């Protein structure tokens, strides 16, 4: 610092002009502070996995492709792992730091002793009851078979809650067939092949088949019947959250900015769909943008209603777990982010 001041003194005629000297000294100190801050925000590596590649996952891809993770000081390794159970195992085992899975998967794992917690969400799943075109009404589903991914999947729990509201009793009026298939697009293929009669799917699934000229019977809507299922929640181990709050806070900021970038810019959204899902049809991109990007929550707090229903459903299927007295979410970081005004800033 002394040499810098001496150099400036010689250039300012013996120090007679103090205002430029003070100004330049202030700029120098600001530069030092900026460099120090940029070093501080280099938070290191974060390993993130998602259980299924769908249009709802776009915000993670957008954050990756547009260097939003780097913007907040993170070097992110983003990987796809097929299936919620396997993805959860990688988190619990320590190979992955953060995962994107259904809330039901996280709650079930926590109920069985896994030290995991939900810290954010991407919103609700817009489940529809999809049937073969020959089935025109709910009454025609009686005696038929509905395909599910597995007996612990979010579609299974949604159906058990939804069917009685539609006048159908599981096990009596309809039966379930475990397909082992997570993708609703693939399950609908089983419907069209006549191997099952109906399944749950999304608005995206309906649009995809209709654009191919294949009609489906949409018999009911889950949300319209008061059934709320998260499309995907952000989950971390409690110990990792405790030891790495700065990393997770930076991740959440990148995630939130990715969501808002998707909302505002359909071209950015479409670019990641082309890269990760091989979707080229702009008509489908337009539908998926409306169904997913525009549906991202403005503040991604875990959905209390979805979690409440998931707990009730899991307890009904696994009464030994007794989940009611447990805490499955931690919103401390999101509350910090909101208190700092980040939501307001990013939405401008």
Region spans (language model):
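Bacterial N-terminal signal peptides that target proteins for export
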Residues: 11-24
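Bacterial N-terminal signal peptides
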Residues: 22-32
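Sec/Tat signal peptide C-region and signal peptidase I cleavage site
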Residues: 34-38
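Short, glycine-/small- and polar/acidic-enriched structural segments
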Residues: 39-183, 187-193, 197-203, 218-222, ...
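Pocket-lining segment of extracytoplasmic ligand-binding domains
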Residues: 103-105, 176-177, 183-277
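Secondary-structure end/capping motifs
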Residues: 242-323
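Conserved C-terminal helix/tail region of periplasmic/extracytoplasmic solute-binding proteins
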Residues: 311-348
């Amino acid at each position: 610092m002394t040499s810098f001041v001496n150099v400036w003194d010689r250039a300012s005629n013996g120090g007679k002009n103090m205002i430029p000297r003070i100004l330049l000294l202030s700029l120098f100190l600001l530069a030092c502070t900026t460099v120090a801050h940029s070093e501080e925000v280099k938070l290191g590596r974060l390993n993130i996995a998602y259980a299924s590649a769908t249009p709802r996952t776009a915000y993670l891809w957008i954050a990756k492709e547009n260097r939003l993770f780097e913007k907040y000081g993170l070097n992110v390794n983003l990987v796809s792992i097929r299936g919620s159970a396997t993805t959860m195992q990688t988190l619990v085992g320590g190979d992955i730091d953060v995962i994107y899975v259904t809330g039901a998967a996280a709650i079930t794992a926590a109920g069985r002793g896994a030290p995991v917690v939900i810290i954010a969400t991407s919103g609700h799943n817009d489940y529809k009851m999809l049937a073969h075109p020959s089935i025109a009404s709910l009454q025609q589903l009686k005696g038929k078979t509905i395909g599910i991914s597995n007996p612990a999947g979010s579609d299974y729990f949604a159906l058990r809650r939804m069917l009685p509201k539609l006048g159908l009793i599981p096990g009596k009026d309809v039966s379930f067939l475990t397909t082992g298939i997570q993708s609703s697009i693939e399950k609908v293929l089983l419907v069209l092949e006549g191997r099952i009669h109906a399944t749950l799917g999304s608005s995206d699934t309906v649009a995809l088949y209709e654009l191919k000229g294949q009609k489906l019977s949409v018999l009911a809507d889950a949300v319209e019947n008061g059934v709320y299922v998260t499309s995907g929640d952000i989950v971390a181990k409690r110990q990792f959250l405790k030891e790495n709050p700065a990393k997770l806070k930076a991740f959440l900021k990148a995630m939130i900015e990715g969501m808002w970038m998707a909302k505002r810019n359909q071209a950015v959204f479409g670019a990641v769909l082309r890269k990760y899902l091989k979707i080229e049809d702009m008509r489908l991109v337009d539908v998926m943008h409306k169904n997913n990007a525009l549906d991202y929550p403005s503040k991604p707090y875990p959905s209390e209603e979805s979690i409440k229903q998931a707990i009730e459903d899991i307890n009904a299927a696994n009464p030994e777990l007794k989940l009611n007295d447990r805490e499955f979410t931690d919103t401390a970081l999101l509350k910090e982010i909101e208190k700092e005004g980040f939501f307001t800033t990013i939405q401008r």
